UniProtKB/Swiss-Prot annotation:
Domain of life: Bacteria
Disulfide-bonded cysteines: none
Catalytic activity: dihydroxyacetone phosphate = methylglyoxal + phosphate
SMART domains: MGS
List of residues binding substrate: 8, 12, 34-37, 54-55, 87
The protein's name in its UniProt record: Methylglyoxal synthase
Function field: Catalyzes the formation of methylglyoxal from dihydroxyacetone phosphate.
PANTHER family cross-referenced by the UniProt entry: METHYLGLYOXAL SYNTHASE
Organism: Clostridium perfringens (strain ATCC 13124 / DSM 756 / JCM 1290 / NCIMB 6125 / NCTC 8237 / Type A)
InterPro entries in alphabetical order: Methylgl_synth, Methylglyoxal_synth_AS, MGS-like_dom, MGS-like_dom_sf
Keyword annotations of the record: Lyase
Example GO BP: methylglyoxal biosynthetic process
Listed EC numbers: 4.2.3.3
């Protein structure tokens, strides 16, 4: 299974903790991430992560293309709902594509934990 990991700046620490908590499970899957999220996960775990561009520089769109091409099976996107994002249209497009292609999507740590418990 290919799993995409994305976290807004204020959610990066939560993503690191999630990756640590589920490191054993995640290690059995192919991981892709936006640039900084992937780097931080790799720096804090033993997980191998293929890094796309940073979200604001096109990384969300890269992962959206993977969703549209059936090249990713699950997306964990820890969003910061209290901070405006300059690339909000890209984020909305990615979320829409997950719905269109019925790709499981977690946008907070609790929903991510529920999904991770099942992989």
């Amino acid at each position: 299974m290919k799993i995409a990991l994305i976290a807004h700046d204020k959610k990066k620490e939560e993503m690191i903790e999630l990756a640590k908590d589920f490191e054993d499970k995640l290690s059995k899957h192919i991981l892709v991430a936006t640039g900084t999220t992937g780097l931080k996960v790799m720096q804090n775990t033993s997980l191998d992560v293929k890094r796309c561009k940073s979200g604001p520089l096109g990384g969300d769109q890269e992962i959206g293309a993977m969703v549209a091409n059936h090249d990713v099976d699950m997306v964990i996107f820890l969003r910061d709902p209290l901070t405006a994002q300059p690339h909000e249209p890209d984020i909305s497009a990615l979320l829409r594509l997950c719905d269109v292609y019925k790709v499981p999507l977690a946008t907070n740590t609790e929903s991510a934990k529920l999904i991770m418990a099942d992989i």
